[in-house]
């Protein structure tokens, strides 16, 4: 690898490696951006061109019974979170009942996002949309193998469909945006291979009037900070789902961003703005 000041050539070298290992590619890619920005004593956000100062993130409630779901939402609400992502994808009628009960309890005090975990059919998806209210978006209702079926959804439903597992690469982004499989792309740096790949997908979305959601798995503040700074550099970023470091028992670093009342704001420190603990 060349001197860290040669960011583009170093990134290009990594882009051609780890073809089937996007997590490792993302780790190298993020490290290169962090080191490069630190060499210039600027934040990653400044280098990428942050245009959104801060955004709220959703926080996730897993597949649970209705009482447990409401209890957990209450806890998050008390902590300041107003955007709640509910994991569904079991039985459609029970999924509808859960959301109906949540709406009865919380009304407009929270915004609901759904992750159907590839668990529904096209008919289930349409039924859910017809029977529920107050849902901001639905992640990946259909299995990856049946992604083509999303084209059968009414345009009104496609407006709130977020492609997740189906969206891995730049080529996927071109296909799904030009043919309107859904009007939201959920980008995860560990899924696509890092900041560079994430930006390529984002630019395709921007050119095709597709909104962006930025997600994660259970991850360190390191990669969450990378995703946050990348997200806030695109005007079509509308949704954050970057709660992956919240429940970690222990992290390798601290810093990166402030999280207050569910709103994420990057720290203006060199690189990712993180420090070893």
Where are these regions (language model features)?
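Metal- or metallocofactor-binding catalytic centers and their adjacent structured scaffolds
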Residues: 1-40
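A generic structural signal for well-ordered alpha-helical segments
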Residues: 36-37, 154, 205, 231
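Catalytic domains of carbohydrate-active enzymes, especially glycoside hydrolases
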Residues: 76-87
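Catalytic core of soluble alpha/beta enzymes
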Residues: 86, 92-225, 250-252, 259
């Amino acid at each position: 690898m060349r001197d860290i000041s040669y960011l583009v050539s170093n990134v290009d070298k990594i882009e051609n490696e780890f073809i089937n290992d996007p997590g490792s590619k993302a780790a190298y890619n993020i490290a290169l951006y962090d080191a490069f920005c630190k060499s210039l004593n600027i934040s990653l956000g400044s280098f990428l061109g942050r245009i959104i100062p801060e955004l709220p993130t959703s926080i996730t409630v897993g597949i649970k019974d209705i009482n447990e779901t409401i209890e957990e939402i209450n806890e998050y609400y008390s902590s300041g979170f107003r955007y709640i992502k509910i994991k569904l994808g079991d039985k459609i009628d029970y999924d509808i009942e859960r959301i109906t009960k949540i709406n009865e309890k919380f009304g407009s005090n929270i915004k609901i996002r759904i992750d159907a975990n590839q668990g529904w059919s096209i008919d289930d998806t349409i039924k859910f949309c017809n029977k529920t209210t107050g849902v901001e978006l639905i992640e990946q209702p259909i299995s990856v193998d049946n992604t083509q079926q999303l084209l059968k959804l009414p345009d009104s439903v496609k407006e709130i469909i977020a492609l997740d597992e189906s969206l891995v690469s730049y080529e996927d982004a071109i296909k799904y945006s030009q043919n309107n499989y859904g009007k939201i792309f959920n980008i995860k740096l560990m899924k696509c291979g890092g900041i560079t790949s994430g930006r390529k997908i984002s630019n395709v979305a921007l050119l095709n009037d597709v909104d962006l959601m930025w997600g994660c798995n259970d991850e360190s503040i390191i990669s969450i900070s990378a995703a946050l700074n990348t997200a806030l550099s695109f005007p079509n970023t509308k949704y954050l789902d970057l709660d992956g470091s919240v429940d970690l028992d222990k992290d390798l670093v601290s810093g990166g961003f402030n999280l207050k009342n569910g709103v994420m704001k990057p720290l203006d420190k060199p690189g990712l703005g993180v420090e070893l603990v």
